[in-house]
Amino acid sequence: MSNLLVLNSSANTGESVSRILIDEAVNQILTAAPGTDVVRRDLGANPVPHLTTANLAGVRGTPSTSEELAARALSDELIAELKAAGTVIIAAPMYNFSVPTSLRSWFDFVLRAGETFKYSEAGPEGLLKGKKVVVLTSRGGLYSEGPAAAADFQEPYLRHLLGFVGITDVTFIHAEKIGFGPEARAAAITGAKGQIAKVAQTFSTVAA
């Protein structure tokens, strides 16, 4: 079994639904495929810095200052983790209809020309083909269908970013309406855990 990269992005380190779900997913996968190597990156507790004038050249240029060199070293580290992973699990709560800025910053540091994608005469080409990603979302309302679906800037955004680097095997598991009260929250978690169990079964097949 190849490496599993686990990305938490919730700023809530307490009873975060997305953290509950990602812990469930990791436990289920390790049960199905005990030999899996897990690399954890908690972007909520230890966020990747935002791109600024001081560090931009470290990711999108030629680094020279200490800030730029530090940004390049972090970018290299994050990209190495991603390249080594056969599967990535992302816990992504919906913040203001999109993703936490900590997750956005992670993408800013790993989407690097020549490393995770390249430009050609035909346009950009992703260099990370063959990987699998499972995205676990938590949402206060219902955005997968109905009138609020037009306000879902989370799933389309993540699908596009992942597709840009060549990752098209992406599964989304949504825990929705968690803001509708305790019963709705519990039902959303239970439903998402059921979907996680089905996804985890595929890992035992791969491991075999």
From Swiss-Prot:
Domain of life from the UniProt record: Bacteria
**Gene Ontology MF terms:** electron transfer activity; FMN binding; oxidoreductase activity, acting on NAD(P)H as acceptor; oxidoreductase activity, acting on NAD(P)H, quinone or similar compound as acceptor
Task: State whether keyword Ion transport applies.
Answer: no
Q: How is the cofactor bound?
A: Binds 1 FMN per subunit.
Q: Which reaction does it catalyse?
A: 2 a quinone + NADH + H(+) = 2 a 1,4-benzosemiquinone + NAD(+); N,N-dimethyl-1,4-phenylenediamine + anthranilate + 2 NAD(+) = 2-(4-dimethylaminophenyl)diazenylbenzoate + 2 NADH + 2 H(+)
Q: What is its EC number?
A: 1.6.5.-, 1.7.1.17
Root EC class: oxidoreductase
* Named cofactor requirement(s): FMN
Keywords, sorted A to Z? Flavoprotein, FMN, NAD, Oxidoreductase
| Binding-site residues for FMN, renumbered to this chain | 10, 16-18, 94-97, 138-141
Name the SUPFAM superfamilies for this protein. Answer: Flavoproteins
The free-text function statement in the UniProt record for this protein reads: Quinone reductase that provides resistance to thiol-specific stress caused by electrophilic quinones. Also exhibits azoreductase activity. Catalyzes the reductive cleavage of the azo bond in aromatic azo compounds to the corresponding amines.
Q: Which family does it belong to?
A: Belongs to the azoreductase type 1 family.
Q: How does the record describe its quaternary structure?
A: Homodimer.
Q: What is this protein called?
A: FMN-dependent NADH:quinone oxidoreductase
